[in-house]
Amino acid sequence: KIQMDKLKNTMTMSVGVNYKGVGRMVYPGIIQILSFLSMNPQTHQKAFHDQILREINGEASEVDRHNTFYDEYLAVMDMTAEFYLSTVDRIFKNREIALNKFSIDNKKIDIENIQNTAVFIIEGANDDISAPGQCLAAVKLLKKLPKNKKISHLQKNAGHYGIFSGKAWRNEIKPKFLKFLDNNNYDC
């Protein structure tokens, strides 16, 4: 297991002199996107190789599928170091939500007592970041929430990014999500 001080020293840095927020400690967005790209390097390499060939052959455009996808996928921003480190420490290492020990501003959030809302869980069958079943397991902590207020959807052939982007989102997930909002009287 990586220690938090090592994570702080290797994954955060201060904002440079020529930028707003100079000196502020952040988890740079570029580290996050490089981490995502490194998980499937062959896929991304092939996508850019094929796009270069389309450019050479005059078959590419600014709004083609490749450019549209990567314009969004590569749009990242820095996170405050405090938020990043706190999330890693509290949620992933110490499992505060899973153990029902989560608090905000020193006020304990009793997850088992949540009852006046509805929850829609969306997971991707091919998610290589948050394995399918993690969100569903967390919903079991909502013991006072009626079953009809707990909805889950496992999207076939979708990964971590794909559940909120592209065809799977537009054609399958979004319609179910909008129906969920309507059924639970949520105004958007």
Predicted regions and their residues:
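Short beta-strand/loop motif that positions the catalytic acidic residue
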Residues: 114-115, 120-123, 127
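Conserved alpha/beta-hydrolase "acid-adjacent" motif
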Residues: 128-137
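Short, conserved loop/helix-junction motifs that constitute active-site signature segments
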Residues: 111-116, 142-147
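Short acidic (Asp/Glu) and glycine-rich catalytic loops that position anionic groups and cofactors
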Residues: 63-69, 117-118, 155-158
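C-terminal alpha-helix
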Residues: 176-187
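Catalytic histidine-centered segment of alpha/beta-hydrolase-like enzymes
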Residues: 129, 153-172
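Alpha/beta-hydrolase-fold enzymes
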Residues: 1-82
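Active-site nucleophile elbow and catalytic-triad environment of alpha/beta-hydrolase enzymes
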Residues: 93-111
